A protein has these predicted regions:
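S-adenosylmethionine
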Residues: 1-426
């Protein structure tokens, strides 16, 4: 039996993600150009849907397969088949089962074809009932968030909010994009409506051939509304110098106000990241930005008080972007948060040294963790008393009582971001 291109592509993506050799965004980007628009849509749904339901699917597999240790190829095929049977009504059961079996055969695991066939057929015939240890276990399984991560959010946000956040992380995020320096602006009126909260941002109703053509031509850039909110908070007056410290891949850098009479610098830690940054900026038609390689955690190669605006979009856990990158929840552990917060503080400290008197430091993350956000800023302010919190230039609804800005997937229907604006006293 022939296997559809969409399922082959989805299986390859999920296998690479499960192996730890790719993230979903990169895996999908590598296979989608070779698929038709219809197959591309199904592949996208299969990959992200299976990842969003992975713990639930694995608990179900444990119920039917017992303690049997599953080979990765078999495990991925079972997840893919079970997801279609349980969550995609439009997919015929025989297609989901038969093509999952053939995927296992294609992976040279012919001895497991009977096992895969039997498990998937049991799912179609038998009652789907899973026993839960407690309420947190139920939500952990039903929303496919590791228990330790859910407990962390319960402790920080309260149970109702933590459960709401976990549910929102499994929703398909709205499609947001923005025009680039190459955009004529005319076509955009037909492919999206203006965002209610972020100037220049447009909201689409789904990936279309027209949008993909505009993206390939460099006229639009796909970027979540919250990420664009961070970029919009960077307000620079004429002639003010700007540096984007952790710039790759260039999503926010591409929105910076550039001109031949303004110093704009963007840099990152490695040459491959700079290559990606340069390619991305060129694709967007962005010029007049100086690129620089450095390790911002160790030292920045600039004199003190060089820049009027310093942007630190710090490396982080990414827990605010789980809607777009569902596999993040399975790759994290508690030690990651401590490692990130230590790195973030070192980068922010070095960044503050090159900030001019009266200048502004914009610190942001795509994490919802207080330890990577408010706590980092609190420690920075104790070490740099010349810095003070000033309100970021964003919609009032996002501003917190502490003078920062926060977005959340469940409350705002956008990724979870944090923004702090610090001003150095003259």
């Amino acid at each position: 039996m022939a296997i559809s291109p969409s399922r082959i592509a989805a299986y390859d993506c999920l296998f690479a993600i499960d192996s730890g050799t790719a993230f979903s965004a990169d895996a999908l980007a590598s296979v989608e150009p070779g698929l038709s628009e219809k197959d591309r849509g199904l592949c996208h749904e299969l990959v992200l849907g299976s990842l969003r339901r992975q713990i639930y699917l694995d608990r179900l597999m444990a119920k039917f397969a017992g303690a049997k240790k599953l080979d990765r190829a078999v495990r991925v095929a079972l997840r893919l088949g079970a997801y279609q049977l349980l969550f995609l009504d439009r997919v015929p059961a025989f297609s989901a089962i038969n093509e999952s079996v053939e995927l296992v055969r294609k992976a040279k695991k012919a001895s497991a074809t009977g096992f895969v066939n039997a498990i998937l057929r049991r799912i179609t015939r038998e009652s789907i009932e899973i026993a839960f240890a407690d309420e947190i276990d139920r939500v952990s399984v039903e929303t496919s968030h590791p228990r330790w991560l859910l407990e962390r959010w319960v402790n920080e946000l309260g149970q109702d909010r933590a459960f709401s956040l976990a549910a929102a992380n499994n929703a398909e995020p709205p499609l947001a994009f923005r025009p680039t320096a190459r955009s004529s602006g005319v076509e955009l009126e037909d492919v999206g409506r203006p965002s209610r909260h972020v100037g220049g941002c447009r909201m689409g109703t789904g990936i279309s051939g027209q949008l993909l053509e505009l993206e390939r031509a460099g006229e639009i850039y796909f970027q979540d509304e919250a990420s664009q909110l961070v970029a919009s908070a960077v307000r620079a007056s004429d002639g003010e110098s700007i540096i984007d410290i952790c710039a790759a891949p260039g999503s926010k850098t591409g929105t910076l106000p550039v001109s031949s009479d303004r110093l704009v610098v963007a840099g990152d830690v490695s040459w491959p990241r700079l290559v990606t940054l340069r390619s991305n900026l060129e694709h967007q038609g962005v010029v007049d930005i100086t690129l620089c390689q450095y390790d911002a955690e160790v030292e920045l190669p600039f004199a003190d008080s060089t820049f009027d605006v310093v942007i630190v979009d710090a490396p982080c856990s990414g827990t605010g972007t789980i809607r777009h990158n569902p596999e993040i929840r399975y790759k994290l552990n508690e030690a990651d948060f401590l490692r990130h917060s230590s790195k973030q503080l070192k980068i922010a400290l070095n960044a503050s040294k090159i900030l001019k008197k009266g200048g502004r430091l914009i610190y942001s993350t795509c994490s919802i963790e207080r330890g990577e956000n408010e706590d980092v800023i609190d420690r920075l302010l104790r070490l740099r008393p010349e810095l003070g919190v000033t309100r970021p230039t964003v919609d009032d609804r996002f501003v917190t009582s502490e003078g920062f800005a926060r977005t959340f997937p469940d409350r705002d229907d956008m990724d979870g971001f944090f923004i702090a604006q610090l001003t150095r006293t003259p």
